[in-house]
Amino acid sequence: GVRTIGLCHGVQGGHRQIAEAFGLKKEEVDIICAGINHQTWYVQIRHNGEDLTGKLLEAFEQHPDFSRTEKVRIDMLRRFGYYSTESNGHLSEYVPWYRKRPEEIGQWIDLGSWINGETGGYLRVCTEGRNWFETEFPNWMKEPAMKYAPEERGEEHGSYIIESLETGRVYRGHFNVRNNGVIDNLPDDAIIEAPGYVDRNGVSMPLVGKLPLGPAAVCNVSISVQRLAVEAAINGDDKLLRQAFMMDPLVGAVCNPNEIWQMVDEMLVAQEKWLPQYAEAIAEAKARLAEGKRVPTKEGYQGAARLHVKSVEEMMQDREAANRNAGESDKGKERAKVSG
């Protein structure tokens, strides 16, 4: 088969935050992260041999920006003892506690900072970026060609992995691979994220040991949801699909079983042409829905935290921001710092 690893830049982003919170440079702080993608935890933080892990909460609580923009992550740090790699709003989408009621979302999520937990946030910024790109691309083609210089090299893993495979120069990063015992208390067949080393021989993953019990519990919920969803999709088993929905933290936070069953019926019918494996289940769902909706729904509801999609004319008011959004593949790289 094809040798494959998964790559993410969440570890690097949180690493920068941690260093800033302590008033240090990123290269002065050593970290070990372990978990699953988007639920990876900084289980060890060291500076000059000193373990700073237990001092991180105070550092974040006292930081003028992070204390406002990272409230979910800080609260998880407070209650679970470890900081998560995932951005504040996105982390709120993996656990059941911070999006239970629309009126409470603003207490945890700063919607003025990037797409930090807004409903359909990625869709909004990508729609705006696409529309702006189509408008502005002819002007971009008139600009000088981009120069690739070593000092401008970013933190994405890809080029460093290629360099290590070709030259043997060792590179340390955090990679997504099949567990195979790297993290003791997560399933062997789960895809985990943990430290690894790359050289001419490929990627080597040292053993991490046990993940702290609380973070492991959070990871295992998502692993269970993913396992149910995969088996449902492969086998066209709508019962497993419904169980996956029930186990999903956000769904379970706001929906009862009857609401979940009807929601799955509606979603299966709406996406019928892409889901041939569910043909029998979709026919049954159509019959149930034809009898009349059993649960009242909010017609036209757009979600609890949706923001306006800007037109090209509106984006013209800030061309620099629009160009950055359209040209940057990492939509979280340039987060606006707005005063609270």
Task: Identify the function of each model-found stretch.
Residues H15, A19, G23-A336:
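Long, compositionally biased stretches enriched for glycine and/or charged residues
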Residues G1-R16:
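Rossmann-like NAD(P)(H) cofactor-binding subdomain of soluble oxidoreductases
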